């Protein structure tokens, strides 16, 4: 343990419009006595010994032995030529207080990455706590009375069916897992989905299904819509050609079980990337494919929970326009606030990483987050998320302040009511006036 100094310069921009005073909360009341005030966190001792952040106080409970479940889902008509039923496989760990009959909420990681890879070189299955994201939940939240669930999407690990790569079938399977987790006799009925990248996309897939059990999502650089991820300003990224086929080949076991994965949605996915890459906007046929894989627009008005958005502002994999972009004139972050959703954000100058992933917060060039590295890692992330989950999954503690924590390019952190600030000046830039020097 050593005293953290990463927030010592935090919030120096408080005089700016849209910032919160140190004693304010979303409800306008001071709740400083319940949790340490965010402005005092730089004075606290944080556990810097591991590879991820820890909560301030250890929990009183222990994790019970892993349990597994298989959920059979009616998939009639979901996949062209696919099976009429398919299984979703998941593993889960309960805290020891469930032995006394206490009901607990669930934090789920929903992923295609369990048993992912070629035979003989696969990642761990769902019944082993996943490195990083699973361990973070297991060590921080299970001792405080939360269940951890690891869910394999259709056609991955021991789940069956077709891998339609974020399509309607995958969304149905995720929804079925959320419903199952919320309906168990040990569950208090409240489920969260947490994860980065694809595992953040599954949070939006679940939100688009509108389960009453899904109370909050924490997408960390999570894809919100596939087409804007791969196609920007009329041009395509090279990876767009192989996204579906790359995942599809990595989940094959090269045995008879792979026959379940031969359905038209999979074939369409193999064609969609190269076709759109080659033809661009001259390819209207594939619009249906990409529309099916846009989830943030479908979730708006259907999802009935909160959102804690985490985004690397230097992320070139799932870049920030997935949060702050959208159709012309749309900023999804603000659109959800305007629609009445309870939204918070942690927006750092890291790349495609977690807020506390210090092992990755060290290799960014000047102008691409390098100036912020010294103050980048958020060792308070575990506590910050704990306070969020306590309120939205258990109804315990004060309502979190619904603000955006944003890191400047020089490393300083500040709080804004939203991002970008509503009173920001937008200055048009005429690119024809910019002179680009020839390389010497």
Describe the role of every protein-language-model region:
Residues 1-34:
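Secretory targeting signatures
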Residues 31-58, 127, 131-137, 143, ...:
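Accessory cap/linker subdomain of secreted extracellular hydrolases
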Residues 50-99:
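N-terminal cap/lid segment of alpha/beta-hydrolase-fold proteins
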Residues 96-101, 162-169, 176-197:
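Gly/Ser-rich "nucleophile elbow"/oxyanion-hole loop immediately N-terminal to the catalytic nucleophile
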Residues 106-182, 358-372:
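Cap/lid segment of the alpha/beta-hydrolase catalytic domain
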Residues 169, 194, 198-263, 313, ...:
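A catalytic-pocket lid/entrance helix-loop region that shapes and gates access to the active site
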Residues 309-311:
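Short beta-strand/loop motif that positions the catalytic acidic residue
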Residues 431-440:
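Residue-level detector of conserved catalytic or cofactor/ligand-binding positions
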């Amino acid at each position: 343990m050593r005293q953290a100094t990463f927030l010592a310069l935090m919030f120096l921009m408080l005089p700016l419009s849209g910032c919160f005073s140190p004693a304010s909360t979303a409800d306008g009341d001071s709740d400083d006595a319940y949790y340490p005030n965010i402005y005092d966190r730089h004075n606290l001792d944080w556990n810097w010994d591991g590879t991820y952040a820890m909560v301030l106080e250890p929990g009183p409970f222990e994790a019970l032995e892993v349990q597994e479940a298989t959920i059979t889902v009616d998939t009639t008509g979901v996949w062209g030529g696919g099976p009429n039923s398919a299984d979703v496989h998941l593993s889960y760990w309960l805290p020891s207080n469930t032995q006394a009959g206490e009901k607990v909420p669930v934090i789920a990681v929903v992923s295609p990455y369990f048993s992912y890879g070629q035979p003989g070189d696969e990642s761990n299955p769902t019944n082993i706590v996943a490195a990083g994201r699973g361990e973070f939940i297991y060590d921080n939240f299970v001792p405080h009375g939360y269940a951890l669930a690891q869910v394999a999407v259709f056609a991955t690990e021991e789940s069956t069916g077709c891998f339609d790569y974020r399509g309607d079938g995958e969304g149905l399977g995720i929804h079925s897992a959320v419903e199952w987790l919320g309906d168990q006799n040990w569950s208090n009925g409240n489920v969260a989905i947490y994860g980065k990248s694809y595992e953040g996309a599954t949070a939006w897939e679940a939100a688009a299904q509108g389960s009453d059990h899904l109370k909050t999502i924490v997408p960390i650089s999570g894809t919100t819509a596939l087409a804007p991820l791969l196609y920007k300003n009329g041009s395509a990224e090279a990876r767009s050609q192989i996204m579906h086929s790359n995942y599809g080949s990595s989940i094959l076991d090269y045995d008879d079980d792979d026959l379940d994965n031969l359905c038209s949605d999979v074939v369409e996915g193999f064609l969609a990337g190269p076709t759109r890459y080659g033809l661009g906007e001259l390819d209207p046929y594939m619009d249906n494919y990409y529309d099916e894989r846009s989830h943030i627009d479908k979730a708006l008005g259907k999802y009935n929970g909160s959102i804690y958005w985490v985004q690397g502002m230097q992320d070139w994999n799932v870049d920030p326009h997935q949060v702050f972009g959208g159709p012309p004139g749309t900023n999804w972050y603000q659109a959800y606030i305007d629609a009445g959703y309870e939204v918070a954000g942690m927006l750092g100058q890291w790349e495609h990483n977690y807020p506390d992933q210090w092992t990755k917060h060290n290799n960014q060039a000047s102008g691409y987050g390098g100036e912020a590295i010294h103050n980048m890692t958020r060792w308070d992330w575990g506590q910050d998320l704990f306070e969020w989950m306590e309120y939205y999954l258990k109804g315990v503690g004060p309502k979190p302040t619904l603000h955006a924590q944003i890191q400047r390019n020089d490393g300083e952190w500040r709080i804004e009511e939203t991002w970008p600030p509503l009173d920001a000046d937008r200055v048009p830039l005429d690119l024809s006036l910019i002179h680009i020097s020839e390389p010497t």
